[in-house]
Amino acid sequence: MFCVQCEQTIRTPAGNGCSYAQGMCGKTAETSDLQDLLIAALQGLSAWAVKAREYGIINHDVDNFAPRAFFSTLTNVNFDSPRIVGYAREAIALREALKAQCLSVDANAHCDNPMADLQLVSDDLGELQRQAAEFTPNKDKAAIGENILGLRLLCLYGLKGAAAYMEHAHVLGQYDNDIYAQYHKIMAWLGTWPADMNALLECAMEIGQMNFKVMSILDAGETTKYGHPTPTQVNVKATEGKCILISGHDLKDLYNLLEQTEGTGVNVYTHGEMLPAHGYPELRKFKHLVGNYGSGWQNQQVEFARFPGPIVMTSNCIIDPTVGSYDDRIWTRSIVGWPGVSHLEGDDFGPVIAQAQQMAGFPYSEIPHLITVGFGRQTLLGAADTLIDLVSRKKLRHIFLVGGCDGARGERNYFTDFATSVPDDCLILTLACGKYRFNKLEFGDIEGLPRLVDAGQCNDAYSAIILAVTLAEKLGCGVNDLPLSLVLSWFEQKAIVILLTLLSLGVKNIVTGPTAPGFFTPDLLAILNEKFGLRSVTTVEEDMKQLLSA
């Protein structure tokens, strides 16, 4: 086992990465190794997808499957070894079908990629785990050095984050051939074990640029189906009655659940990154979408244990449900998996609803506590002139984007302390689950404009980028000249690709933490600092002083 893709990875003087029987996330060495094998199979599939496009062949089954299966290897998504192997077998079957399509056009069709003809050696998980040792990401570290390995992983993990957003967009009916062609090209190239530093740096920026397009079609998918988010108050306390909790990012799953629970007497609560769903008109129209429950994903083992109904996980982040003894009432969807828990293969939530009706639910309604979400792209753009007016009248000094992933490390209190230390004449724009560090606090307003503006999920960084570009155009300056600072928390691969997106767009002087990714070497950090001004958080006082004086 070698895995260094998330913030909680083991860090020692000898090196970083989880490399024992179990990773810090709870992933076993077996599952981790089989995910490496799956990635190799997906690289071979992408290699043939690239070749097929040379013949004008676009196989939509391949395009639909590849990013989704890659998504299953993202942190806290799928811990079920047999399902990971199932994805690998499906990847190889699709590859062979695509290869046959190519050979039907050109009998000499050949794909020159190390992964192009990969076959699984056995049905036995132990044998497959031994085969996976050929594809462990650090197998040639001694030959290439830590810097090249770190850049490879930056590209691999960044592309994994983009694949997750591609899948989110795909389930909403969004498809862009250029994006998929680019994805396959990069995935196939990474399967060649590249070792050129400049080429890898260029690839990282290409992934960031591609992901901007992915976020654009995801935004289109969400707003086309569910309307543009508008500011909405959400209750974060319990309402009397039977209940279901839904977590993750998949708004389509939420919509289907709301449709199927309507009239059943079962209330629905959002959790984690589902919180922004309350801002969408076509979702909040369901009166039994009664509120948001819980806090950051890392607290779920306590909070889920207390929730008096079933829980549905639509994407990341799931952690061991046996700890809180709620594994008999947690359900996984799509690419999510945990050994021994119930998995929903399709869109029928009937079994979940039946379980909710058999459980007690909340015995009484608590005194409501309302927070505001729903500052989507249209709302943000509609406020652009107001922001400019406040800046020109010196009522608004600075905007801080404080957001990103949450996690369990104590150092993450930095982001709470930072938000509460922002001066009263400054605004906080937030997104992703890092907001749970401070989103239930009261920040007041500036002439009626809330000082805390919740822009949505992690992928809604797209809205923040569009707002920044609009403000810069209206003010006749560059984005980096705006009174705007980005203070980002990272945990997993979606955050990595958001960072690459921002860097590829030329955004500079981003402050990130609480720690640097474990695959970043001192040399890589120095390169990113020199090129982009990227740096790690220090103290709240020092960072605030520096950002306000920039």
UniProtKB/Swiss-Prot annotation:
InterPro entries: HCP/CODH (IPR004137), Hydroxylam_reduct (IPR010048), Prismane-like_a/b-sand (IPR016099), Prismane-like_sf (IPR011254), Prismane_a-bundle (IPR016100). It is found in: Cytoplasm. GO terms for cellular component: cytoplasm. GO terms for biological process: response to hydrogen peroxide. One of its GO terms (molecular function) is hydroxylamine reductase activity. Its EC number is 1.7.99.1. Keywords: 2Fe-2S, Cytoplasm, Iron, Iron-sulfur, Metal-binding, Oxidoreductase. Hybrid [4Fe-2O-2S] cluster binds at residues 249, 273, 317, 405, 433, 458, 492, 494. Its cofactor is [2Fe-2S] cluster; hybrid [4Fe-2O-2S] cluster. Catalyzes the reduction of hydroxylamine to form NH(3) and H(2)O. This is Hydroxylamine reductase. It comes from Salmonella schwarzengrund (strain CVM19633). The gene is hcp.
